[in-house]
Amino acid sequence: MAEISAKMVQELREKTGAGMMDCKKALTEAGGDLVKAEEVLRKKGLSAAAKKTGRAATEGAVASYIHMGGKIGVLVEVNCETDFVARTEGFQGLVKEIAMQIAAASPRWVRREEVPADVVAKELEIAKAQAREQKKPEAILEKIATGKVEKFYSEFCLMEQAWVKDDKKKIQDVLTDAVAKIGENIQIRRFARFVLGEGLEKKQENLAEEVAKAAGLQK
């Protein structure tokens, strides 16, 4: 068992706002891993961030981010509790980081609860079919499929994606850190990601025909 030092307890307390004993218990349960201990506190509703999530967040900002010379654009709405916080540098910086994440990582939904049931069912079906193709035992197909769906969530649900600036953190962790630091409930409400030409068929013309047209040989 990992030794839990006073410094570790203090660090977790400063990060989460939870009590000293709760922090020590969480660290013990997590084997000394600070990130896992933070998750333990959140699940038990003991962290400051967890306590703030029930508060209404109706202020905030809608921000845009344009990447790669105008080829990718993002609009995102992030909510907080007060207009004062919405105008702060810390909150505005957070919104920009989230917009950049969306541009870089191409999520489809904010959280897993938004994924349509038919999409989840299809992913399960595909995962099972792949497992059968690999001659996996029928008894473990469900477990394999569930694992594949979890991976699907981590790839396409924004809150579960690895942060592009630090892949040891998920976006949920980034948000939790911001809540603890800023002191208000913060929620990512919705986003839209645009890619130039996405869904359009580019017209492919024959090179010889293009030359002929340029030379005035074809009408």
From Swiss-Prot:
Q: Which family does it belong to?
A: Belongs to the EF-Ts family.
Compartment annotation = Cytoplasm
Q: Which UniProt keywords apply?
A: Cytoplasm, Elongation factor, Protein biosynthesis
Q: What does this protein do?
A: Associates with the EF-Tu.GDP complex and induces the exchange of GDP to GTP. It remains bound to the aminoacyl-tRNA.EF-Tu.GTP complex up to the GTP hydrolysis stage on the ribosome.
Q: Where is this region: Involved in Mg(2+) ion dislocation from EF-Tu?
A: 82-85
Q: List the disulfide bonds.
A: none
**Where is it predominantly found?**
cytoplasm
Superkingdom of this protein's organism: Bacteria
- UniProt-listed InterPro entries: EF-Ts_dimer_sf, Transl_elong_EFTs/EF1B, Transl_elong_EFTs/EF1B_dimer, Transl_elong_Ts_CS, UBA-like_sf
Record-linked Gene3D superfamilies: 1.10.286.20, DNA helicase RuvA subunit, C-terminal domain, Elongation factor Ts, dimerisation domain
Alphabetized SUPFAM superfamilies for the sequence: Elongation factor Ts (EF-Ts), dimerisation domain (SSF54713), UBA-like (SSF46934)
Q: Which residues form a coiled coil?
A: none
State the name under which the record lists this protein. Answer: Elongation factor Ts
Q: Name one GO cellular component term.
A: cytoplasm
Q: From which organism does this entry originate? A: Anaeromyxobacter dehalogenans (strain 2CP-C)
Q: Which gene encodes it?
A: tsf
- Gene Ontology MF: a single term: translation elongation factor activity
